[in-house]
Amino acid sequence: MTATNHPKLFKRPVDGVLLLDKPGGMTSNEALQRVKRLFHAKKAGHTGSLDPLATGLLPICLGEATKFSQFLLEADKSYSVKGRLGVRTASGDSESPILTERPIPKLTKRALEKTLFAFRGVIDQTPSMYSALKHKGQPLYKLARQGIEVERKTRQVTIYELTLLDWDNESIELYVHCSKGTYIRTLLDDVGEALGCGAHVVALRRLRVAHYHEDQMIKLAHLEREYDKANYTGLDRYLLPLETMVSHFPAIKLSSSTAFYLQQGQAVMVPNAPTHGFVRLRDQNDQFIGIGEILSDARIAPRRLIQKR
């Protein structure tokens, strides 16, 4: 009997980040719940959904790691995406009805690069009706499935890199490095319209989230093979420390007294601290205890602190 079908599981406090390689055909929440059961975790969350058809990097936060998930939600991300040309669909992927079919013009690398150039930098996107954004409390995709369409506000996103990887008479493959909130399905749909033939996503893989990359990913099938009901803590070796989630912030070492007051919720002065932004907090033993923020008066206020076990 595996952790995924065991009727009653002992749940424990376990902290860390798992860089899951989400398989295709599974929702992000389904993947999350399976990982949560495998680790017997009391608390778990992910840091930004992937579409069911998508594969790749889905950071799973266990225990105290959930306190820092916002920093990965707000991080840049990278993808490889393959699109079919000549066919536009309602959702921008292969899992919804076809809207239009048009002939594909003769494409050259020069013409493709010229089209892609317009989508680099800061661009406006109108989210698809088949997205998790909410309208009056209802996810847009649920409204779309009822045949209801509502007006969506455009949003600005940044495409840091948009590289043509491959193309042929029917498809195009791109590498995308983008800011938070970028809809890859919408991006490919817009590129297809700019080419005059339409396009939709047939394969999508997330390669990076912040500084985490695909070489660090663990497959769900591997975890399930490694799972041992009698020694489930054996999977803990795949968890990364909490501090890796915020390693891009400068670190501040605290004295025992300043660490004490911060942990009581009080803002403190720390010599030679940065003048603005978030900082990693380390106690007198050089142990990570959480994240603080520099206030306008130069004091450091606690923002996310780890609960000591």
Curated annotation (Swiss-Prot):
It comes from the Bacteria. Keywords: Isomerase, tRNA processing. It holds the Pfam family TruB-C_2. Its EC number is 5.4.99.25. Signal peptide: none annotated. InterPro entries: PsdUridine_synth_cat_dom_sf (IPR020103), PsdUridine_synth_N (IPR002501), PUA-like_sf (IPR015947), PUA_sf (IPR036974), tRNA_psdUridine_synth_TruB (IPR014780), tRNA_sdUridine_synth_fam1_C (IPR015240), TruB_C (IPR032819). It catalyses: uridine(55) in tRNA = pseudouridine(55) in tRNA. Belongs to the pseudouridine synthase TruB family. Type 1 subfamily. Responsible for synthesis of pseudouridine from uracil-55 in the psi GC loop of transfer RNAs. NCBIfam families: TruB (TIGR00431). This is tRNA pseudouridine synthase B.
